[in-house]
């Protein structure tokens, strides 16, 4: 998730911007840059890599002091990390920094090329700044309104115009942006930590707002161009709390960012109601020729692959296999030229997963990577890439990255099914619309925190528990169990519910918790029967099911009911309460939620 800072006032804008960007480093970034107003125009300085590289460049340049500028730390979404792809992006008249994704940037770029504009980078932001430039005729607000009316997507923008050297224009749509109030100076930022060294007074831009910031004051306009007032707030957070957005832990913050991550990942890949992979080389003709899909990952990514396997086989009727990367690379897998290997990794640097990718390529099998980090080793090595736009994930236990890995796998499964004629256009559009709606479907689950917290308090002293489920629910059992044990240190195992009688049931004794997932209608009665078996042996059964499901008396100790949703997409809703349950168990047990013992965010060794 990119970081934005803007400053106008009597101080050195360069220093204020660097201070602010440093406080946003926790968001993750691969490059940084600033734009500073000068007597002869706007000077842009940017650099790939750490903020220290940008500092060094600025020290070498020794620019005249400027009292107005904008800065940016970039998390790549379009174009690999590089100086040319870094922000700010500029024309001789306009400079901008941007957080968000412009969904229709390709079509806009073609129109701008037809008007004579040229492009140096691969980014959607360069398209945006040149679109604004094309609409600029001396009045910045009119230019911004005209340009943004043509844009589809999300953005938080800070904009400089050469003709207005003492003014920052800020615009917000579906990406967070605030302004800070000072004395004879004012600020723009994507998050509060960037401001706290200089001010604690701020206002939050509402959807569609534009703010005009000068040293003397800030004016607000709504999406219709009407002058409005925005409430002045006072931040009473310390720096650590500010970085977490007011949440006690990054993990809880990231769980609550899942709706936005779903929208950012899915929306740009839907056109005319149909899923689009946005990979020109991976044509429908190639999809029709795929033999077997091999899904490979480690830990949570492998669990996402299990959901993907079930979706691919259910929707596209294509054989699919799931492998743990460390097993795949050493078991001499049978791979055929017509197969496709899908590599799943949040970081794009996972050692075993990268080795599995290299093995597949050495056998002449095409590789599609699903990763969250643009320009990562896996992204560079794969034949095709689909990025998950989760933004940086700070907590070691993956939550929002897993969520959008599922979304990308569903998009792939739907396109594969459509290309192969297994789904009609009508049915494909139905599933795609349901997937787009997922961000709204999960919001009530995020609001159920108190119920989940209460249940966690009832199970907090548990030493061992079991998860059971069938089909998609089994895949979710594995992930729910992993989340619980990795952050709360409660021993937990997950089993296919039908396997209980094949040994596992011998471990069920009085008071042992069994978390039963029963959201799939075609196997609901069988899963309930399995849960009842454990209950009859003294287990405490926590049942997750849907609102319309009939739960026989005596089956469950507690029941969590989910909204009705398509069975195939139900994992998107079910995972949220499972993540929250693990989170609150860890909190109540006094565990280090964001940094569990012995674990690393990216495993780059075997």
Q: Where are the language model's segments positioned?
A:
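Conserved short alpha-helical segments that host acidic/polar catalytic motifs at enzyme active sites
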Residues: 1-244, 248-249, 257-292, 330, ...
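A SIS-like phosphosugar-recognition module
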Residues: 163-164, 175-177, 183-184, 202-246, ...
């Amino acid at each position: 998730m990119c970081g934005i800072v803007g400053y106008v006032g009597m101080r050195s804008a360069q220093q204020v911007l660097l201070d602010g960007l440093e406080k946003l480093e926790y968001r993750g970034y691969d490059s940084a840059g600033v734009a500073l107003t000068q007597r002869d125009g706007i000077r842009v300085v940017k650099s790939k890599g750490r903020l220290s590289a940008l500092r060094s460049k600025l020290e070498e340049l020794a620019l005249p002091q400027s009292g107005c500028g904008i800065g940016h730390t970039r998390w790549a979404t379009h174009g690999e990390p590089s100086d040319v792809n870094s922000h700010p992006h500029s024309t001789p008249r306009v400079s901008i920094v941007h957080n968000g994704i412009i969904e229709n940037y390709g079509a806009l770029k073609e129109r701008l090329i037809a008007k004579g504009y040229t492009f140096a980078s691969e980014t959607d932001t360069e398209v945006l700044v040149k679109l604004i430039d094309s609409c600029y005729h001396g009045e910045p607000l009119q230019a911004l309104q005209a340009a943004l009316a043509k844009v589809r997507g999300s953005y938080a923008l800070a904009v400089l115009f050469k003709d207005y050297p003492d003014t920052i224009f800020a615009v917000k749509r579906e990406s967070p942006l605030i302004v800070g109030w000072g004395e004879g100076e004012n600020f723009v930022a994507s998050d509060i930590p960037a401001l706290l060294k200089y001010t604690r007074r701020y206002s939050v831009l509402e959807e569609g707002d534009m703010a005009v910031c000068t040293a003397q004051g800030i004016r607000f306009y709504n999406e219709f161009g009407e002058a409005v007032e925005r409430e002045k707030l006072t931040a009473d957070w310390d720096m650590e709390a500010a970085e977490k957005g007011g949440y006690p832990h990054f993990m809880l913050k990231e769980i609550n960012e899942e709706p936005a991550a779903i929208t950012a990942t899915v929306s740009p890949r839907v056109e005319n109601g149909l899923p689009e992979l946005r990979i020109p080389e991976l044509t429908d003709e190639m999809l029709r020729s795929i033999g077997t899909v091999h899904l490979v990952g480690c830990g949570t990514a492998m669990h996402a692959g299990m959901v993907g396997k079930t979706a691919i086989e259910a929707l596209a009727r294509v054989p699919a296999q799931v492998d743990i990367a460390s097993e795949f690379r050493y078991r001499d897998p049978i791979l055929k030229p017509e197969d496709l290997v899908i590599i799943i990794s949040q970081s794009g640097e996972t050692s075993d997963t990268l080795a599995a990718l290299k093995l597949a390529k050495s056998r002449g099998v095409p590789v599609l990577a699903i990763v969250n980090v643009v320009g990562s080793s896996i992204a560079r090595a794969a034949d095709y890439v689909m990025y998950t736009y989760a933004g940086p994930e700070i907590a070691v236990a993956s939550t929002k990255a897993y969520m959008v890995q599922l979304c990308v796998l569903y998009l792939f499964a739907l396109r594969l099914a459509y290309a192969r004629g297994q789904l009609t256009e009508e049915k494909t559009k139905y599933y795609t619309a349901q997937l787009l709606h997922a961000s709204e479907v999960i919001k009530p689950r995020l609001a159920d925190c108190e119920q989940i917290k209460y249940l966690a308090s009832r199970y907090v002293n548990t030493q061992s528990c079991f998860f059971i489920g069938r089909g998609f629910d089994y895949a979710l059992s594995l992930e729910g169990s992993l989340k619980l044990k990795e952050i709360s240190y409660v021993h937990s195992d997950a089993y296919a519910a039908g396997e209980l009688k094949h040994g596992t049931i011998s471990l069920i004794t009085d008071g042992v918790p069994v978390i039963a997932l029963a959201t799939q209608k075609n196997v609901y009665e069988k899963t309930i029967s399995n849960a009842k078996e454990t209950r009859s042996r003294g287990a405490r059964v926590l049942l997750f099911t849907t609102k319309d499901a009939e739960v026989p008396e005596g089956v469950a100790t507690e029941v969590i009911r989910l909204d009705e949703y398509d069975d195939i997409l139900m994992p998107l809703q079910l995972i949220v309460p499972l993540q929250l349950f693990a989170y609150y168990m860890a909190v109540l047990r006094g565990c280090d939620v964001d940094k569990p013992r012995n674990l690393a965010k990216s495993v780059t060794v075997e």
